[in-house]
Amino acid sequence: LLCLFGHAHAFNPDLGNFRIECINRLNFSEKMVSNSAGSLEVFVSSNTEWTSEPRSKWLSVDRSGGKGDLAVRISFEENGTEKRTGIVRFTADGVNPVEIIITQSALTFTNPITIGGNIATMPDPYIVKDGDYYYTCKASGNGIAISRSMRLTVVNATTKKWSLPYEGPSKPWNIADLWAPELFHIGDRWYVYYAAGRRGQDGITGYGTQRSGVLRSKTDDPLGEWEDMGMLYTGYDYQPGIKPTAANTEYAIDLTTFELKGQRYAVWSGNGTDAVQQIRIATMSDPCTISSSMVILSTPTQSWETMDGRKINEGPAILVNEEKGKLFIVYSCNPSWTKNYRLAWLMLDMNDGDPMNPADWQKSSNYAFWRCDNTKEPVSGVNGLGHCTFTKSPDGTEDWIVYHAMRYSDGGWGQRYPFVQKFTWNADGTPDFGEGAGWGEPLLLPSGETL
């Protein structure tokens, strides 16, 4: 979007060869254009970087009597992913029109990305690329909502596809607090992994009954109908054929899945009775069934994981560096409602490592991604970030991270907004997430994404 605004100062109808100058770069700036006939301020507001024609192509207004308002119109000749050329045309009664050709050299977007055209909260954002589309999966009250978009940086309005059951004689395990759904295309079906519990029933006031469950699509269309496939076993005493219940499992949230060498695994955040949230793993016999006892991979022990005394590892996300043969579990640490929320990782050698052996996983020596602007309402900023997932640019050439950031340093759970940004890789095969993007900071569009 390019907007130009003009204000006249002692404007003389006898313009006398009044010149509108093209500058080399127009980027959130203003320009005073003047001569003996008066002056005109040209304000430029843009969400991109622009370049103009060189000085040799400056245009002048012929001497003539001008009157009335100056009209400005811009039209584009092309729409591409690398540049876009536009013509700015200035007209006024009695004055020959003036045209300026401007080339938009880089297309940009800003965070937080919009949802249905609006800036809105989206904690634990999950966006997955499948074919030409990006699918967004999010909690919507006590339901799961999904949408589809051709663009990573624009989330279309979501539609609720499934809701938690109500309380009844069977006392369902999953009637409240639907958290962090994740969407996967496995074989010819789609699956959603989510957490829920029974808070508010039977005298339960906390979140200790949170367990992980799975939904399966009835067709190969994630925007179609879904069916509940039940709770997943997240305990430490697995027996073949065991039926998962709240009694024989433990607190389990943020479950995700990956496959390595033909074996599928479930990874989640869980704890027992000591309130220490750990990253845990188990094997799966199919996308709806965990087939082993859980194994603990990570316990929060580092100072940067326990900054306010609470011990939390959660939000595991799978990231693979195929070229270097590395598989990462990128997780969040510290409380999600605080400005200390950040990312770290566990790394496995995909060639020689056993995902079920904690000794084969290497923890990052420090946190890997964080930002805190310490802004308080009404000043927007980035104050703690985490609970991520990963995807590719539309043309598949770039790696992108999706995460949420808190708007205010004391914003809590209610101020988490969706962010996306490109990341790269270090020479040793570990991810380089760089610095968290700022609130409203222009970033280049993902490669292959058009407006």
Sequence positions of predicted segments:
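Solvent-exposed, low-complexity, repeat-rich "mucin-like" stalks and linkers
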Residues: 13-16, 22-52
